[in-house]
């Protein structure tokens, strides 16, 4: 093989389809838009959800619920994620963000009981599940709601 014999991989270089260049191309005259009608016009297309004037599905279905403006979203941390800290560490929300366990604090941190804890830690968080609090205390650590 020589440099002038190099060719791109099959299918990696797709040729752009040029429309309106004669009937023989298969996309001449109307350029693949069919005859007349709204979708044949320039800029002419229907918005998403439009059903030709029929009452659209999203308006036929009843409204449900509301958005609680006071909703709090907690960053979730499981017990097995706390194993990355050394024995005797005081785990705070700031430390969890700094070490990359959670991206951001959100409205607070909630510790859940998935996995097992192998270290003795003092954990400070906004909320604890019952199983998480029990597991932390069982290892001789402490949990504190802040």
Swiss-Prot record:
<feature type="compositionally biased region" description="Gly residues">
    <location>
        <begin position="23"/>
        <end position="35"/>
    </location>
</feature>
<dbReference type="GO" id="GO:0006412">
    <property type="term" value="P:translation"/>
</dbReference>
<keyword id="KW-0694">RNA-binding</keyword>
<dbReference type="InterPro" id="IPR030878">
    <property type="entry name" value="Ribosomal_uL15"/>
</dbReference>
<dbReference type="GO" id="GO:0003735">
    <property type="term" value="F:structural constituent of ribosome"/>
</dbReference>
<dbReference type="InterPro" id="IPR001196">
    <property type="entry name" value="Ribosomal_uL15_CS"/>
</dbReference>
<keyword id="KW-0699">rRNA-binding</keyword>
<protein>
    <recommendedName>
        <fullName>Large ribosomal subunit protein uL15</fullName>
    </recommendedName>
</protein>
<comment type="similarity">
    <text>Belongs to the universal ribosomal protein uL15 family.</text>
</comment>
<dbReference type="InterPro" id="IPR036227">
    <property type="entry name" value="Ribosomal_uL15/eL18_sf"/>
</dbReference>
<dbReference type="InterPro" id="IPR005749">
    <property type="entry name" value="Ribosomal_uL15_bac-type"/>
</dbReference>
<comment type="subunit">
    <text>Part of the 50S ribosomal subunit.</text>
</comment>
<comment type="function">
    <text>Binds to the 23S rRNA.</text>
</comment>
<feature type="compositionally biased region" description="Basic and acidic residues">
    <location>
        <begin position="1"/>
        <end position="13"/>
    </location>
</feature>
<keyword id="KW-0687">Ribonucleoprotein</keyword>
<dbReference type="Pfam" id="PF00828">
    <property type="entry name" value="Ribosomal_L27A"/>
</dbReference>
<dbReference type="GO" id="GO:0022625">
    <property type="term" value="C:cytosolic large ribosomal subunit"/>
</dbReference>
<dbReference type="GO" id="GO:0019843">
    <property type="term" value="F:rRNA binding"/>
</dbReference>
<feature type="region of interest" description="Disordered">
    <location>
        <begin position="1"/>
        <end position="56"/>
    </location>
</feature>
<keyword id="KW-0689">Ribosomal protein</keyword>
<dbReference type="InterPro" id="IPR021131">
    <property type="entry name" value="Ribosomal_uL15/eL18"/>
</dbReference>
